[in-house]
Amino acid sequence: MGKISSLPTQLFKICLCDFLKIKIHIMSSSHLFYLALCLLTFTSSATAGPETLCGAELVDALQFVCGPRGFYFNKPTGYGSSIRRAPQTGIVDECCFRSCDLRRLEMYCAPLKPTKSARSIRAQRHTDMPKTQKEVHLKNTSRGSAGNKTYRM
């Protein structure tokens, strides 16, 4: 014997089906077209593979992500490394031939440059101090000058 469902459950199913039939009948054909278009858009974007960045699009994306820091096409390596490494892959290999995300793009950004802070007077060397007019004149006279004057050897 088959399973007998309760009366309230059957009534709910009938009412729901009738409600949906009325709603679909009331909807105009343009509404149905837009609904189908939305469903098609969502399903096609869900099945589409990840996009790749090549050429000018890759450069534009790097400029946007890295900003004024700039970027490298190959990953920067440490200095003084004498160990032979396998050939490096660059941003083109990682983002043009395969898809990459924002974190992968950020790996190719140049490091932030430290901001130049104002040096204190104590930290300045004596050669950084401006020379007075008298000091400049004394140095020039000790070396001699052009014309009839003699030069020191």
Swiss-Prot record:
A: annotated span: 90-110
D: annotated segments: 111-118
Composition bias, Basic and acidic residues: 125-138
GO CC annotations on file: alphav-beta3 integrin-IGF-1-IGF1R complex; exocytic vesicle; extracellular space; glutamatergic synapse; insulin-like growth factor ternary complex; interstitial matrix; neuronal cell body; neuronal dense core vesicle lumen
Annotated Polar residues bias: 139-153
Subcellular location, record wording: Secreted
Residue segments, region B: 49-77
Stretches that traverse the bilayer: none
Cysteines engaged in disulfide bonds, as pairs: 54-96, 66-109, 95-100
GO biological process assignments: androgen receptor signaling pathway; blood vessel remodeling; bone development; bone mineralization involved in bone maturation; branching morphogenesis of an epithelial tube; cardiac atrium development; cell activation; cell development
GO molecular function, one term: insulin receptor binding
Propeptide span(s): 119-153
Keyword ATP-binding: no
Pfam families xrefs: Insulin
Start and end residues of each stretch annotated as Disordered: 119-153
Similarity comment: family membership: Belongs to the insulin family.
Known partners and oligomeric status: Forms a ternary complex with IGFR1 and ITGAV:ITGB3. Forms a ternary complex with IGFR1 and ITGA6:ITGB4. Forms a ternary complex with IGFBP3 and ALS.
Primary role: The insulin-like growth factors, isolated from plasma, are structurally and functionally related to insulin but have a much higher growth-promoting activity. May be a physiological regulator of [1-14C]-2-deoxy-D-glucose (2DG) transport and glycogen synthesis in osteoblasts. Stimulates glucose transport in bone-derived osteoblastic (PyMS) cells and is effective at much lower concentrations than insulin, not only regarding glycogen and DNA synthesis but also with regard to enhancing glucose uptake. May play a role in synapse maturation.
Protein name: Insulin-like growth factor 1
Taxonomic source organism: Rattus norvegicus
Gene designation per UniProt: Igf1
